[in-house]
């Protein structure tokens, strides 16, 4: 069984924020695979589905981002899901907007939703679908948290459906072929000299403020 988790913050006031692109992606996935209606449990809402012939649970934690692990870990225990069967969809500052990349394992790179899941589960050895939202543009007034807790601009909104479609297709590919094969298909690298920081296999060093255990906690000091 697969447990596919989309990260975000509950409430209408957060629904269109960059930080909620994981929620958006899990909703798009639910539509694509015709999942059952979402029901409340595990401090979140979950739905049953079949993806590429596998039974799956789609989960949206309703704990606010910083406490996502309080929802994910009980769901894993209840459904007897191993870390290798967990897929987390989340926003990624270190990828340009519209870029979707797969990754297995690693740390949280300053993402407080991942931080909570790793803390509660005791391991980071699970799959991630990273949806790029980019870093704040030059001249942005505010902290990184203010940026991810703000809406997409008009150009981004026009491209967002394609980004969500990429995320959905990535999950379908993982379910059908496994992470390694899916990464070979989905993590297409740019031409030499065109590589963006953070692209590829997710192994690039995060920005200084986002390194584990150093600097202020980025994206989600606010809910």
Swiss-Prot record:
Task: Give GO BP annotations, semicolon-separated.
Answer: protein quality control for misfolded or incompletely synthesized proteins; rescue of stalled ribosome
Residues the record lists as binding tRNA: 14, 64, 66, 112
According to its UniProt record, where is this protein located?
Answer: Cytoplasm
Q: Where is this site: Discriminates between blocked and unblocked aminoacyl-tRNA?
A: 9
Any one GO MF annotation of this record:
tRNA binding
Could you name the Gene Ontology cellular component terms for this entry? cytoplasm
| Gene3D superfamilies, per the entry | Peptidyl-tRNA hydrolase
Q: Which reaction is this enzyme known to catalyze? A: an N-acyl-L-alpha-aminoacyl-tRNA + H2O = an N-acyl-L-amino acid + a tRNA + H(+)
Q: Where is this region: Disordered?
A: 183-223
What Enzyme Commission number(s) apply to this enzyme? 3.1.1.29
The transmembrane segments are: none
Answer yes or no on keyword Hydrolase: yes
Major subcellular site: cytoplasm
Q: Where is this site: Stabilizes the basic form of H active site to accept a proton?
A: 91
Active-site residues (renumbered): 19
Q: What class of enzyme is it?
A: hydrolase
UniProt keyword annotations, A-Z: Cytoplasm, Hydrolase, RNA-binding, tRNA-binding
PROSITE patterns per record: PEPT_TRNA_HYDROL_2
What Pfam families does the record point to?
Pept_tRNA_hydro
Q: Which domain of life is it from?
A: Bacteria
Instruction: Identify the InterPro entries for this entry.
Output: Pept_tRNA_hydro, Pept_tRNA_hydro_CS, Pept_tRNA_hydro_sf
The protein's job, in short, is: Hydrolyzes ribosome-free peptidyl-tRNAs (with 1 or more amino acids incorporated), which drop off the ribosome during protein synthesis, or as a result of ribosome stalling.
Q: Which HAMAP family match?
A: Pept_tRNA_hydro_bact
Q: Extract the PANTHER family matched here.
A: PEPTIDYL-TRNA HYDROLASE (PTHR17224:SF1)
State the family it belongs to. Answer: Belongs to the PTH family.
Q: What is this protein called?
A: Peptidyl-tRNA hydrolase
- What species does this protein belong to? Sorangium cellulosum (strain So ce56) (Polyangium cellulosum (strain So ce56))
Q: What is the lineage of its organism?
A: Bacteria, Pseudomonadati, Myxococcota, Polyangia, Polyangiales
């Amino acid at each position: 069984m697969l447990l596919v988790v989309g990260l975000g913050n509950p409430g209408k006031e957060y629904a269109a924020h960059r930080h909620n692109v994981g929620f958006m992606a899990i909703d798009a996935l639910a539509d694509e695979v015709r999942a059952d209606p979402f029901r409340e449990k595990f401090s979140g809402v979950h739905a049953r589905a079949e993806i590429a012939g596998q039974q799956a649970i789609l989960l949206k934690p309703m704990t606010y981002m910083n406490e996502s692990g309080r929802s994910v870990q009980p769901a894993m225990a209840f459904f007897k899901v191993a870390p290798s069967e967990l897929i987390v969809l989340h926003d990624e500052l270190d990828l340009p907007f519209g870029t979707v990349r797969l990754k297995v394992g690693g740390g949280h790179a300053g993402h407080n939703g991942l931080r909570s899941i790793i803390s509660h589960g005791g391991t980071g050895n699970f799959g991630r679908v990273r949806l790029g939202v980019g870093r704040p543009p030059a001249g942005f007034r505010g902290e990184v948290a203010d940026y991810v807790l703000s809406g997409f601009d008009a150009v981004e909104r026009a491209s967002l459906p394609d980004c969500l479609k990429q995320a959905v297709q990535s999950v379908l590919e993982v379910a059908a072929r496994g992470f390694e094969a899916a990464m070979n298909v989905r993590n297409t690298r740019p031409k030499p000299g065109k590589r963006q920081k953070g692209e590829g296999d997710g192994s690039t060093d995060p920005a200084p403020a986002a390194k584990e255990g150093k600097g202020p906690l980025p994206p989600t000091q606010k809910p």
